[in-house]
Amino acid sequence: IQTAHEAFQITRKVPSWKRTEVLEKVSEGIKANREKFARAIALEAGKPIQSARAEVDRAVFTFKIASEEARRIYGEIVPLDWLPGNENRIAHIRRVPRGPVIGITPFNYPLNLVAHKVAPAIAAGNPIIVRPATQTPVSSFLLAQVVLEAGWTPGGMQVVPTKTSDAKPFV
């Protein structure tokens, strides 16, 4: 958790164009290692290879969509004319990274459900700690390697495989 807080001091300052670039590289990295990911999923989750490949393809898409959304984290302009004398006042709301995120995932989609936690966290500029299912941690480790190679901050994605009882302090 301390490492994630330290990484947050960096990730919170990463501009949206850079987060977009990292997410695109993650998408490309997963696609380039499609068979490696599919074999890992098939072996650790017991899925047929075709289903595992479909899951990898979905994760590629998830990171691609997140790369596009990283550009669209807008703020809002809110009128403050609720009281007399405030007719010409407005508030500007800016969306900013909040801090480390914990992603706890089940075993049935060991890559795609992790991707659905990691991609939005990166898009928003937050570090993430992933606690994968004890039965299926390998694809999370493979993904963490791709994320690091894509240029995300060291410590910005961590994988902590633990028993459920040991994960309670994270919650």
What residues fall within each predicted segment?
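Rossmann-like NAD(P) dinucleotide-binding subdomain of oxidoreductase/dehydrogenase enzymes
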Residues: G75-V171
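Glycine-rich loop-to-alpha-helix module at the N-terminal edge of alpha/beta enzyme cores
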Residues: I1-Y74
